[in-house]
Swiss-Prot record:
UniProt pathway: Pyrimidine metabolism; CTP biosynthesis via de novo pathway; CTP from UDP: step 2/2
Family label: Belongs to the CTP synthase family.
Catalytic reaction equation(s): UTP + L-glutamine + ATP + H2O = CTP + L-glutamate + ADP + phosphate + 2 H(+); L-glutamine + H2O = L-glutamate + NH4(+); UTP + NH4(+) + ATP = CTP + ADP + phosphate + 2 H(+)
Protein name as catalogued: CTP synthase
Length: 552
């Protein structure tokens, strides 16, 4: 039977519940247990797909095409279990499901209330999510409850967790509470009162945490841990210090060294083998002792909030681990390029344009792409970054001066990039879209496989075919492909059913490394293996740096 660990947060948000939950999962997996994770989000949106990156950060796409919280990306990077749609749900989905049942008459005329109907539905979603785990029936399901204890929107989720713990019985569920222990510089000491009050809030609703994870900018002294233990009624050895680290991949070892996994296993009456965190130690060793160093410029419009590119940043870090190369990322606002030109790019070893939406900043990205192509600087374009690379090539090489995307200019006569109106999803069902379709949940989403053209750089990187995740509603227009290919551009991968261009590149006779992909390879990169596309990109950046150094 699956046992549950509920992870809650207190005092403030953004303390790192997702990293803590993923790190615990990684330790338990290293002990031979089958583990899955779920994220419960208390907002009323059905999913984060239409939320601003400035408010929510990255939208992580699962294999089965769900638009989910970025914490699911952390989960997949830390454990081997793949996430699915059932691993993330929101208040919006819960209420939508309950209202549908009420309309069907499932409640037989009863008054539908938060308790028991909403809380029962939350419990059903949790158990369904655990049961759908790709690892088979999990030994442990770690459930991260979003928001902060005390927030009104989190109360139904906390109440559902309390009821579920009671229903499952002793040794079947436990609670881990992550809280802040701030350092007050003027007083010169850590303050435990916010943690005490946060635990008090939990106890008011009937939840007694078994473990406290105390976030601070430094290790918490024993005297402070004893004080927290006494006032929160949590054993002293279960008051665990989680201090700031320069890499999230150090957190599993930090938690294991303080016995978190032992406490959880004892509470759940599990007796797995000892933890083997040698892989994490090796990763940290590689991270701290690179042999080379490169600087890659990421040109986008969300550069002031790097959470918008979380998986992409981590994918570059994974590539750095597997190429022994420290990757410095410079975030460059594409609107600044529009105003000031490309001088800010000239010291870079490579240029990357990530995915995005909307017209704002696109001409700056196109200018950056033009610079990378003409200066022979390695270039990687992802999703929108590929579409803009095709537009730049069409304008400046092929001579289609009005080339554009209908996303930015619906009336352009040279629709090099246009809305996809029909395609097959990963189950083989036909999806259709028009300009008037809803924005939410209407993109081409999820993992799709396509063959690669022999003799291309794409084949060198991936092999015979590619299976990556998508999140887009616009695509390179096949009508213009013959003109693009006549100019030298190579479409190196296409979908087998709809013949949609999935990858483009320039031949080495035109450029040493210039690749665009319509999919999002960052979603499948892990620290264990890295990703072949990002490894090749970092190697190209290093080769460019060394060539420029030799010329100098």
């Amino acid at each position: 039977m699956t046992k549950y660990v509920f992870v809650t947060g207190g005092v403030v948000s953004s303390l790192g519940k997702g990293i803590a939950a993923a790190s615990l999962a990684a330790i338990l997996e290293s002990r031979g247990l089958k583990v899955t994770l779920l994220k419960l989000d208390p907002y009323i949106n059905v999913d984060p797909g239409t939320m601003s990156p400035f408010q929510h950060g990255e939208v992580f796409v699962t294999e089965d095409g769900a638009e989910t919280d970025l914490d699911l990306g952390h989960y997949e990077r830390f454990i081997s279990t793949k996430m699915r749609k059932a691993n993330n749900f929101t208040t919006g989905q819960i209420y939508e499901s309950v209202i549908r049942k009420e309309r069907r008459g499932d409640y037989l005329g009863k008054t539908v209330q938060v308790i028991p109907h909403i809380t029962n539905e939350i419990q059903a979603f949790i158990e369904r999510g655990a049961a759908s785990a790709t690892c088979g029936e999990p030994d442990v399901a770690i459930v991260e409850i979003g928001g902060t204890v005390g927030d009104i929107e989190s109360l139904p989720f906390l109440e559902a967790a309390r009821q579920m713990s009671l229903r499952l019985g002793r040794n079947s569920a436990c609670f881990v509470h992550l809280t802040l222990v701030p350092y007050v510089a003027t007083a010169g000491e850590l303050k435990t009162k916010p943690t005490q009050h946060s635990v008090q809030k939990l106890r008011e609703i009937g939840i007694l945490p078994h473990v406290l994870l105390c976030r601070a900018d430094r290790r918490i002294p024993d005297d402070e841990s004893k004080k927290i233990s006494m006032f929160s009624n949590v054993p002293e050895d279960a008051v665990i210090s989680v201090w700031d680290a320069d890499s999230i991949y150090k957190i599993p070892q930090m938690l294991h060294d303080q016995g978190l996994d032992r406490i959880i296993c004892d509470e759940l009456k599990l007796s797995p083998k000892e933890a083997d965190l040698s892989m994490w130690s090796e990763l940290v060793e590689k991270l701290e002792h690179p042999k080379h160093e490169v600087t890659i410029g990421m040109v986008g419009k969300y550069v002031d909030l790097t959470e918008s590119y979380k998986s992409l940043i981590e994918a570059l870090r994974h590539a750095s681990l597997h190429t022994s190369t420290k990757v410095n990322i410079e975030y460059i606002d594409s609107e600044e390029i529009e105003s000031n030109g490309v001088d800010s790019l000239k010291h870079l070893d490579a240029v990357l344009v990530p995915g995005g939406f909307g017209r704002r900043g696109t001409e700056g990205k196109i200018a950056a792409i033009r610079y990378a192509r003409e200066a022979k600087v390695p270039y990687l374009g992802i999703c929108l970054g590929m579409q803009l690379a095709v537009i730049e090539f069409a304008r400046d090489v092929v001579g289609l001066k009005q080339a554009n995307s209908t996303e930015f200019d619906p009336d352009t006569p040279e629709r090099v990039v246009a809305l996809i109106t029909e395609w097959y999803d990963r189950e083989g069902k036909v999806e259709t879209r028009t300009e008037s379709s809803d924005l939410g949940g209407t993109m081409r989403l999820g993992s799709q496989r396509c063959p690669i053209k022999p003799g291309t750089m794409a084949e060198e990187i991936y092999g015979k075919d590619v299976n990556e995740r998508h999140r887009h509603r616009y695509e390179v227009n096949n009508r213009f492909v013959p003109q693009l290919e006549a100019g030298g551009l190579i479409i190196s991968a296409r979908t087998p059913s709809e013949d949609l261009p999935e990858m483009m590149e320039l031949p080495r006779s035109m450029h040493p490394w210039f690749v665009g992909v319509q999919f999002h390879p960052e979603f499948t990169s892990t620290p264990r293996d890295g990703h072949p596309l990002f490894k090749s990109f970092v190697e190209a950046a290093l080769a460019n740096k060394q060539a420029r150094g030799a010329e100098a």
